[in-house]
């Protein structure tokens, strides 16, 4: 009798563990939720860690961000609900595009390699940052053009300005890149977005 009770208790214990595991797995499979923090005018976007999604780590935080380009539009609509101020909206959108580009970089290279290159190679860090800034520029330009705050013809001038600003900024924190190489990065992103 005692043996039967012990076996029954053991089976129940195992079943409870299986149920607990299934619930945890189900929780992980849920669609990632979006969280916003708009303190000090910064728009940070957090997604719950989810399998097969890009994962990059910045400022000792885990950034888990969707890869699909359409997600920026979806997120942009949500951000638009949070602010009616146009300039603040453009800033938010640009910041989100910047971080999403870093996530794409991490996704294509693999998190570990991306992290290693970013931290140990000033050249790659500069390229990663310029690509992220180019994505930011594209998002801001598209939003400004759509809201009739900017003409498409002005994109070339914006690129020239961003290249000059980025190289001054990079020289102070990372390393400078040749102007031609920096310009190529911005133009590549603008062409891909059909802005030039």
Language-model features: where?
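Short, solvent-exposed loop/turn segments at secondary-structure junctions
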Residues: 40-41, 71-74, 101, 110, ...
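Post-HEXXH active-site segment of zinc metalloproteases
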Residues: 90, 106-134
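Long, well-structured alpha-helical subdomains associated
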Residues: 125, 138-196
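Catalytic zinc-binding patch centered on the HExxH motif and its immediate surroundings
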Residues: 24-81, 89
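Preference for well-ordered, secondary-structure-rich cores of eukaryotic proteins
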Residues: 67, 91-93, 158-163
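Short hydrophobic helices that act as membrane-entry/anchoring signals
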Residues: 1-23
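Active-site recognition of the HExxH zinc-binding catalytic motif
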Residues: 94-107
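Compositionally biased, charge-rich terminal segments
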Residues: 1-6, 136, 143-145
């Amino acid at each position: 009798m005692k043996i039967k009770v012990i076996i029954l208790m053991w089976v129940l214990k195992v079943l409870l563990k299986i149920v607990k595991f299934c619930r945890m797995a189900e929780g992980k499979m849920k669609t990632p939720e979006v969280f916003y923090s708009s303190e000090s005018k910064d728009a940070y976007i957090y997604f719950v860690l989810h399998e097969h999604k890009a994962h990059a780590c910045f400022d000792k935080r885990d950034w888990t961000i969707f890869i699909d380009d359409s997600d920026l539009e979806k997120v942009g609509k949500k951000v638009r609900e949070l602010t009616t101020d146009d300039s603040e909206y453009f800033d938010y959108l640009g910041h989100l595009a910047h971080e999403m580009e870093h996530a794409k970089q991490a996704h294509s290279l693999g998190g570990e390699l991306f992290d290693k290159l970013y931290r140990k190679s000033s050249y790659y860090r500069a390229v990663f940052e310029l690509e992220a800034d180019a994505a930011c520029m594209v998002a801001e330009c598209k939003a400004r053009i759509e809201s009739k705050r900017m003409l498409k013809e002005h994109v070339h001038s914006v690129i020239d300005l961003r290249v000059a600003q980025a190289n001054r900024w990079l020289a102070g924190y990372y390393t400078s890149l040749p102007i031609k190489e920096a310009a190529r990065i911005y133009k590549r992103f603008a062409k891909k977005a059909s802005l030039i």
